[in-house]
Amino acid sequence: MLSETMPSEKLVKDFMRPLDQYHYVKEEETVQDVLQLMDKARQEGKPQCLIVVGGEPSEKEMIKGFVTPSDLVFGLMTHFLKGAEKSGPIFWEGQFEAECLDGMNKRAREIMTPIRAYVRESEMLMEAVFLLNKYQEDFLPAIGKEEVVGIIHIHDILTHMIRLASGKRGASEVRSVPFHK
């Protein structure tokens, strides 16, 4: 009787998005290029997370990290924000535009979030939740046998939680829904 009421355990592969739903950027591309690609992803309704790959021919399929909207905003302001923390209140006028323009020639590798963890696609969803929390990430690569086969995103987990709350327990398929971050 208890087994009839227990929901089946969901796996990472039930929620991950395949790699073809993401745009790729080479690690040596400029922030200006990255911003254009991020805008393209947004307009296409794709995840606003760019996959950063190596720039060398031998590394072109090696995933080095991700660039998210947070990486773009805070990555351009890194030295300024660190200085502001130490000195306290400062004069802000014109600072945002100046920092943005100064940072346009930075490289994707300078602002990306490197991959610090991954989860196997065959793991239970709770393992992904644990790792996302542990590393304070929103995205996590999902590994098949020996390579990255997809990416699980916290928004897709949240979508499932919302479905659970509304009584739609069986619906675990990931829909392509535009989201921010």
Model-derived features: positions:
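Tandem CBS (Cystathionine beta-synthase) repeat/Bateman regulatory domains
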Residues: M1-K181
